[in-house]
Amino acid sequence: MMTNIWHTAPVSALSGEITICGDKSMSHRALLLAALAEGQTEIRGFLACADCLATRQALRALGVDIQREKEIVTIRGVGFLGLQPPKAPLNMQNSGTSMRLLAGILAAQRFESVLCGDESLEKRPMQRIITPLVQMGAKIVSHSNFTAPLHISGRPLTGIDYALPLPSAQLKSCLILAGLLADGTTRLHTCGISRDHTERMLPLFGGALEIKKEQIIVTGGQKLHGCVLDIVGDLSAAAFFMVAALIAPRAEVVIRNVGINPTRAAIITLLQKMGGRIELHHQRFWGAEPVADIVVYHSKLRGITVAPEWIANAIDELPIFFIAAACAEGTTFVGNLSELRVKESDRLAAMAQNLQTLGVACDVGADFIHIYGRSDRQFLPARVNSFGDHRIAMSLAVAGVRAAGELLIDDGAVAAVSMPQFRDFAAAIGMNVGEKDAKNCHD
């Protein structure tokens, strides 16, 4: 039940600097690879959000020793087949990454397990991982329409030659992990760009994989060893404050230590194509990942047409991109959005409804949206709905900097799924985002 409401107020300027939280995708993968490694791994910059804590809790239930002291998470790995049978179903909460990646590991174990989640997660499509895992020899029983709960009877797997039907990093990573635990060689034929954190991180644990054009080759039977990892700042999290700075008057914001992996950086390119002044300073590498300090200035934006090849690379940032589009002069068109309908919510429908509530004209189809932007945009004061989706909640909070009055956001606290520090970061640059109990709010 929704028990809180966020409220926002417009701003006359934004300024300041923040060091953004650790990357969520990398935090998941670091925990999973560390658990499969032999020896101890130390992770610095781990993102302790609800999604990543679901992965941590599941690994603990599988017998992995995970400790946190100040800013360092220590994992004592158990090797490929050292996980222990869980005593109860493993609850992945709202985390699709946790469920899909862990399924690839559990399919190769020698015990039975069940992966479940909240109402939202148990509606999300799982056939994309079930089909190839079954081809590898897995036994997985799902709910109707290939959704969770997933009942997994672990057994030896065999490598396969498989063409990925969509550019999904979760699917790709699930099969890389399963391939490591399988007999023989797994060849994955990719289609389009998806984030490559698993491929970059695996060699840091001593793992090997061969990457050719549109092909990833994984050989089973390797051994991983513990290491020390620094998690870069989360670009998806930084995107909210980038857009806030672009659309707020008299804004100059610095965001430190942001990962700028080219398979994640489409949001930067798209905002720059709209006319956004975004500068990358002090570019360097943390381990295998490129990092920069990002400086963003208020800019007059213009509408653009987003080419289909950008969508997979920017899928998580599209809700906040829609807010930028509403403040851009002219029409923005985004197509190829079928995947946006099967995220934590139907993000296409949810964002369209909220934009219309805020006074933004938009046309929505099965997999596209036209947003009719205005450079003098002032969002209408209104009560809007996060639909229980963290990225929608934070996108609406950013819209508050350009509203004509107060915005009320139902269930804003769902932001903790990926960024529990959102309101702290917002306050640090001058945004006004508060919280009140729902029973004290009225339409």
Swiss-Prot record:
Keywords: Amino-acid biosynthesis, Aromatic amino acid biosynthesis, Cytoplasm, Transferase
HAMAP family: EPSP_synth
SUPFAM superfamilies, alphabetized: EPT/RTPC-like (SSF55205)
Swiss-Prot/TrEMBL GO biological process terms: amino acid biosynthetic process; aromatic amino acid family biosynthetic process; chorismate biosynthetic process
Gene3D superfamilies found in the cross-reference section: Enolpyruvate transferase domain
Top-rank EC class of the record's enzyme: transferase
Pathway(s) it belongs to: Metabolic intermediate biosynthesis; chorismate biosynthesis; chorismate from D-erythrose 4-phosphate and phosphoenolpyruvate: step 6/7
Protein function: Catalyzes the transfer of the enolpyruvyl moiety of phosphoenolpyruvate (PEP) to the 5-hydroxyl of shikimate-3-phosphate (S3P) to produce enolpyruvyl shikimate-3-phosphate and inorganic phosphate.
Similarity comment text for this entry: Belongs to the EPSP synthase family.
Subcellular location: Cytoplasm
GO molecular function, one term: 3-phosphoshikimate 1-carboxyvinyltransferase activity
Protein name: 3-phosphoshikimate 1-carboxyvinyltransferase
Coarse class of the protein's main subcellular location: cytoplasm
NCBIfam families to which the protein is assigned, alphabetical: aroA
GO cellular component: cytoplasm
Residues the record lists as binding 3-phosphoshikimate: 24-25, 29, 168, 170, 316, 343
Subunit and interaction comment: Monomer.
Residues engaged in binding phosphoenolpyruvate: 24, 96, 124, 170, 347, 391
Catalyzed reactions: 3-phosphoshikimate + phosphoenolpyruvate = 5-O-(1-carboxyvinyl)-3-phosphoshikimate + phosphate
EC identifiers of the protein: 2.5.1.19
Location of the active site: 316 (proton acceptor)
Superkingdom of origin: Bacteria
